[in-house]
Amino acid sequence: MHIANFTNTYLPVISGVVRSIRSFRDELTHQGHNVFIFAQEHADYIDQDPFIFRYPSLNLPTEIDIPTAIPISPFIDRLLPAVKLDVIHTHHPFLLGQTAATKAQELNLPLVFT
């Protein structure tokens, strides 16, 4: 299967959400699935794993140091139909979660929300 995960937080942030996504990604990949991660970008961070795609982000003045995704990316808009996804999974109801729901509807794909 080709599985897309949309998340408002991913590496280099360490959190329960990130750990869960990485665990699912590792196991699903081990089972032969292709897992694509769509998350916010982090300045000066370079992903080590394949199939991680980043949305532009803003660093808002908050107590936590997690950039906020700007859910607009013409590149990702073109990429999503090309990878022939089977399912979209989102981990948040807002920002990239809403983007995931919209993309699932546009591409006529099932949406999983946890």
Model-derived features: where do they sit?
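Histidine-centered active-site/metal-ligand motif
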Residues: 33, 89-92
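Short, well-ordered beta-to-alpha junction loops that form the rim of enzyme active sites
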Residues: 8, 92-93
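Structural motif
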Residues: 38, 90-91, 114
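Residue-level recognition of alpha-helix initiation/capping sites
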Residues: 12, 19, 71, 94-95
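Active-site proximal beta-strand in glycosyltransferases
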Residues: 3, 87, 104-114
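Short, hinge-like loop/turn segments at secondary-structure boundaries
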Residues: 51-56, 70, 106-108
